[in-house]
Amino acid sequence: MSESRTSADGGMETSYGFREVPDGQKQGLVNQVFHKVAKRYDIMNDVMSMGMHRAWKDAMISALNPRKEPGYKVLDVAGGTGDIAFRIVEASGRQAHATVLDINGSMLGVGAERAEKKKLSGNLTFVEANAEELPFEAGSFDAYTIAFGIRNVPRIDAALSEAYRVLKRGGRLLVLEFSEVDMPLLDKIYDAWSFNAIPQFGKAITGDAEPYQYLVESIRKFPNQENFAAMIRQAGFSRVTFTNYTGGIAALHSGWKL
């Protein structure tokens, strides 16, 4: 879980994968990871999920069911390459406007380039900012989405509080994230894949295994489904639920600002 702890010398520390690092260092380390993988991010997701992330994202968009009417506004956080935002805009019949927010400029650059090629630039705004301090007024969005990004935020509680703040009354939060496998045999298989195969595939694809090692470790440090649902409730959300995908390899969390 990404929560701060006091170190032996009295400073505050948080987890970066299986390592403990000073609070102020995690964001910079995470940024380095995503600068390295930005241009191969979709391949990275294929490796991390054994290709299943595409079906999970489709299920997320189906759950959101974006309105097919002008004025529907979605904030997609940690969505730099645009994958989720593109799906939302298309599912709305190109009526929705999606603001793609990411702290990493390299990821946003990839997304903006793809948006232009898809002729979706008019439906999208790309913003470089921190999920813990969103540069938007309260009640600005109908929906807030984040896919495979919340576990990389140093202060998850702050990000959830900000999500609640910027949503309109009646707005919805959807968080898709790797989670805790709830099937013993699958758990063993997925662990073997994660710790043995994923870093090596990453090295073969990008020449660097370290980003993939961090990403695998960050999944194991993330709160399980029940604990993360409790964090969402603590941020003020109502009707909080989660749905497991592929035996809990991933989970979709939902909450409403009522």
From Swiss-Prot:
Region: Disordered, residue numbers: 1-21
One GO term (biological process): menaquinone biosynthetic process
Keywords: Menaquinone biosynthesis, Methyltransferase, S-adenosyl-L-methionine, Transferase, Ubiquinone biosynthesis
Residues at which S-adenosyl-L-methionine binds: 81, 102, 130-131
Pathway(s): Quinol/quinone metabolism; menaquinone biosynthesis; menaquinol from 1,4-dihydroxy-2-naphthoate: step 2/2; Cofactor biosynthesis; ubiquinone biosynthesis
EC assignment: 2.1.1.163, 2.1.1.201
EC top class named in words: transferase
Stored PROSITE patterns: SAM_MT_UBIE (PS51608), UBIE_1 (PS01183), UBIE_2 (PS01184)
UniProt key word S-adenosyl-L-methionine: yes
CDD domains reported in the protein's UniProt record: AdoMet_MTases (cd02440)
A Gene Ontology molecular function term of the record: demethylmenaquinone methyltransferase activity
Stored InterPro entries: SAM-dependent_MTases_sf, UbiE/COQ5_MeTrFase, UbiE/COQ5_MeTrFase_CS
Signal peptide extent: none
A Pfam family this chain is assigned to: Ubie_methyltran
Reaction catalyzed: a 2-demethylmenaquinol + S-adenosyl-L-methionine = a menaquinol + S-adenosyl-L-homocysteine + H(+); a 2-methoxy-6-(all-trans-polyprenyl)benzene-1,4-diol + S-adenosyl-L-methionine = a 5-methoxy-2-methyl-3-(all-trans-polyprenyl)benzene-1,4-diol + S-adenosyl-L-homocysteine + H(+)
Family designation: Belongs to the class I-like SAM-binding methyltransferase superfamily. MenG/UbiE family.
Functional note: Methyltransferase required for the conversion of demethylmenaquinol (DMKH2) to menaquinol (MKH2) and the conversion of 2-polyprenyl-6-methoxy-1,4-benzoquinol (DDMQH2) to 2-polyprenyl-3-methyl-6-methoxy-1,4-benzoquinol (DMQH2).
Name of this protein: Ubiquinone/menaquinone biosynthesis C-methyltransferase UbiE
Species for this entry: Rhizobium johnstonii (strain DSM 114642 / LMG 32736 / 3841)
